[in-house]
Amino acid sequence: MPKIETPTDNRFVQNFIKNGGKFLYSENENEVNKNITLIIEENSWKKSNLISLDKNISKRFRLDYSFSKDSKDKTICLISTCEYLIADDGSILVSSNQVAEKKLDELPGDIIILAKTDQLINNISEGLSGIKNNSKSIPSNITNLKHFKDCNDKDFLSYGSSSKNLYLILLENQ
């Protein structure tokens, strides 16, 4: 009897939560706004502690758009989009389109990712192919966010990774 494969969206959510991520589903833009407000309230953040490197997000939520060494000290949370959501391991593929040339350890410890259901894919190979096919030029900084809870430095596979407190707000495509 053939093995029944779990749908891509279910597999992603299961692996994402297993990695320590916090998942919020939104049917429309109003729910996205409400979820962001709830996250901000839950963590007692101020808007001045939030930043985005995406002009559209910065404008939409009235956030700072610059990210310097000075702003890193007061910045608690980055709000960003992503390239793809990887179902096989529950990770989030980002590039210089979202995080500029910043390394993961240079980003704030708290991150809110805004994504749509059409960004769900099976594996990282599909994600890299998608970036190559959809980009005029391949982004210089491509990485994935996978460790959302404290990593054990004795775990060889997560050595050097920067764990993040990560929220994902997934918007249903209209």
Region locations from a protein language model:
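The feature marks the mature, well-folded catalytic cores of soluble enzymes
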Residues: 1-174
